[in-house]
Swiss-Prot record:
Forms a ring-shaped head-to-tail homodimer around DNA which binds and tethers DNA polymerases and other proteins to the DNA. The DNA replisome complex has a single clamp-loading complex (3 tau and 1 each of delta, delta', psi and chi subunits) which binds 3 Pol III cores (1 core on the leading strand and 2 on the lagging strand) each with a beta sliding clamp dimer. Additional proteins in the replisome are other copies of gamma, psi and chi, Ssb, DNA helicase and RNA primase. Confers DNA tethering and processivity to DNA polymerases and other proteins. Acts as a clamp, forming a ring around DNA (a reaction catalyzed by the clamp-loading complex) which diffuses in an ATP-independent manner freely and bidirectionally along dsDNA. Initially characterized for its ability to contact the catalytic subunit of DNA polymerase III (Pol III), a complex, multichain enzyme responsible for most of the replicative synthesis in bacteria; Pol III exhibits 3'-5' exonuclease proofreading activity. InterPro entries: DNA_clamp_sf, DNA_polIII_beta, DNA_polIII_beta_C, DNA_polIII_beta_cen, DNA_polIII_beta_N. The keyword Plastid does not apply. GO terms for cellular component: cytoplasm; DNA polymerase III complex. It is found in: Cytoplasm. Its main location: cytoplasm. It comes from Lactococcus lactis subsp. lactis (strain IL1403) (Streptococcus lactis). SUPFAM superfamilies: DNA clamp (SSF55979). Coiled coil: none annotated. Belongs to the beta sliding clamp family. Keywords: Cytoplasm, DNA replication, DNA-binding, DNA-directed DNA polymerase, Nucleotidyltransferase, Transferase. This is Beta sliding clamp. It holds the Pfam family DNA_pol3_beta_3.
Length: 380
């Protein structure tokens, strides 16, 4: 039967990571549990909600864990309650002892807490991914790609393919990440170094958001595997599995205008433009159509927003450069604010075709690697 002692902080950190995959709203009751597997070489914590699964391995020689294993086995414990109990234990070291009928005794200092466990045999078998070709990437790079795209996914479940980020390896040796909710789009291209893994998949936005909390060391390299309907992200101790969204993602390249189609090219200070949109949004949230109007006439660039109930906003913008024709176009300022949040460059380039065609945003001096697209709103 299981028996081990471990540093509470190291164990608690592993619990926190694993619990990212455990939800309360699951169709299989066993998936509200945490599975603990103890072997001579270490402890594995397993959590899953059916869509995301995490295996977190604490090796016995982990210096921070100060682990001593006296007995092996496996058990299921109520995840949320167990995490709360561990966090309240008084001493730095905790002892975990399995008793009869899967009861667990936690000892820390003068505290003893008994928990009712369950046989691990009732836990669903997690689908394994066969290790074949893989792609290695730094956590920091993956997080950047996800941040630059995931905000544009749809929240409407009636079109599932748009609730995830489309990831595709291209014949040009690049990774393409793209997301759209049909009102806006964000696309990122990243050169890859000799990747053997070829794929065309849709990764759910919920998996992406959890990924950021699971892999916290931005400088480490992780390995990516894909098999059937699953994607695996793995480092030395954590295996993070995600189900993929079924379906074919539309060709978004056709949405990006040709260079010759643009009739107006503007460059702004990104921070100034965002602050202007923030002020305009104060009024647009009070209106039914929620739009701001951008009017370009000669050297003048003006934003306006009106609310019959509240008032109006009129602000002149300074364009760092302007090439092309005059234009008046209306759009949702929320979309532009979201787009500017993920652009790190100090200056942003915005190009227009007409007042009824989508316009594009890019960091200034950026080539085709990162482009965003926003659809205007037709107003009377």
């Amino acid at each position: 039967m299981i028996k081990f002692s471990i540093n509470k902080n190291a164990f608690q950190n592993a619990l926190r990571i694993t619990k990212q995959a455990i939800g309360s709203k699951v169709t299989i009751p066993a998936l509200t549990k945490l599975k603990i597997e103890v072997e001579e070489n270490g402890i594995t914590l397993i959590g899953s909600n059916g869509q995301i699964s995490i295996k977190n391995f604490l090796p016995v020689d982990n210096k921070d864990a100060s682990m001593l294993i006296s007995g092996t086995g496996s058990v299921l414990l109520e995840a949320a309650f167990f995490e709360n109990v561990v966090s309240q234990l008084p001493e730095v070291t905790l002892e975990f002892t399995e008793k009869e009928q899967k009861q667990v005794l936690l000892t820390s200092g003068k505290s003893e807490i008994t928990l009712k466990g369950l046989d691990s045999e009732i836990y669903p078998h997690l689908q394994e991914i066969s290790e074949g070709s893989s792609l290695k990437m730094k956590v920091k790079v993956l997080k950047e790609i996800f941040t630059e795209t995931v905000f544009a996914v749809s929240t409407q479940e009636n079109r599932p393919i748009f609730t995830g980020v489309h990831l595709e390896t291209l014949s040009t040796g690049e990774l393409k990440a793209v997301a759209t909710d049909s009102h806006r789009m964000s696309q990122r291209l990243l050169p890859l170094e000799d990747s053997e893994l070829k794929f065309d998949v849709i990764l759910p936005s919920k998996s992406i958001n959890s990924f950021k909390n699971v892999f916290t060391n931005d400088e480490e390299e992780i390995e990516i595997f894909i098999s059937g309907s699953q994607m695996l992200f793995r480092n030395e101790t954590i295996s993070y599995y995600s189900r993929l969204i079924e379906g074919s993602y539309p060709d978004t390249n056709r949405l990006i205008p040709n260079e010759a189609d643009y009739t107006l090219d503007l460059v702004f200070d990104a921070a100034q433009l965002r602050h202007t949109m923030d002020r305009a949004r104060l009024l647009t949230v009070m209106t039914t159509n929620g739009t701001v109007k951008l009017t370009v006439s000669g050297d003048s660039v003006v934003t306006t927003a009106n609310s019959p109930e509240v008032g109006s906003v009129h602000e002149e913008l300074t364009a760092l450069s302007k090439e092309g024709n005059d234009l008046a176009i209306s759009f949702n300022p929320e979309y532009l604010i979201d787009a500017l949040k993920v652009i790190k460059a100090p200056e942003v380039r915005i190009r227009f075709i007409s007042n009824v065609r989508p316009f594009t945003l890019q960091p200034r001096n950026e080539e085709s690697g990162f482009v965003q697209l926003i659809t205007p709103v037709r107003t009377n």
